[in-house]
Design a protein with these regions (language model features):
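Active-site Tyr-X1-5-Lys
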Residues: 1-21, 43-51
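Short glycine/serine/threonine-enriched helix-capping/active-site loop
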Residues: 21-24, 92
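C-terminal substrate-binding subdomain of Rossmann-fold SDR/epimerase-dehydratase oxidoreductases
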Residues: 33-186
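Proline-glycine-enriched beta-turn/loop adjacent to the NAD(P) cofactor-binding site
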Residues: 26-29
């Protein structure tokens, strides 16, 4: 459906001169991200584990690589796309790559949870060094069929023509998500 929408926009732009731009937005996250998305699952679970309201988080592919940006940056890019002198197609991304496991490690560090990773593959686990409990494990049922292992965007065109670049780093995004989640329990 995304590909169809893209080509429909291009068709109407070219055929009828409609101001129709496409924004190809790589993964963009915020504290309000839905609970079925991996970043939200990770943040929510680690905050709950820290507060002793949850024991373990079960995930799929820890080695999927994503280009995660902050939704605030992406909203700004959308506005800039609409202000540009002519319609065009744009890639909005951070040009940064991070594995799911790296995202977990950053979140854990922010929450002062020291993880010890053990084993490889489907048996890989993370143990909280303080409590000695397994708090992250893997289950095949969370591996998505047809999942793309590597997603990284190049926003150089937007940088050059729109003068847009992301302001928020991954640590800022993680901090915002964690603070939002912690506030729900205070």
């Amino acid at each position: 459906s995304k590909v169809f929408a893209y080509h429909t926009s291009v068709y109407y732009r070219d055929a009828f001169g409609i101001f129709a731009s496409n924004g190809i937005l790589f993964n963009h996250e915020s504290p309000r991200r839905g609970p079925t998305f991996v970043t939200k699952k990770i943040v929510q679970a680690l905050v709950r584990i820290k507060l002793k309201k949850q024991q373990c988080l079960t995930l799929g592919n820890l080695y999927a690589i994503r280009d995660w940006g902050h939704a605030k940056d992406y909203v700004e890019s959308m506005w800039k796309i609409l202000q540009y002198k002519k319609p065009d197609d744009w890639v909005i991304a951070t040009n940064e790559e991070m594995t799911v496991k790296e995202f977990i490690n950053k979140c854990a560090k922010k929450l002062n949870i020291t993880l010890q990773w053990k084993f490889k593959g489907i048996k890989e686990i993370a143990i909280d060094k303080n409590s000695k409990k397994t708090i992250i494990k893997i289950d095949k049922k969370y591996f998505r069929p047809g999942e793309v292992d590597f997603l990284k965007g190049d926003y150089s065109k937007a940088k050059k023509l729109l003068k847009w670049k992301p302001k928020y780093k991954s640590d800022d995004l993680i901090n915002d998500m964690i603070e939002y989640e912690k506030d729900l329990y205070e």
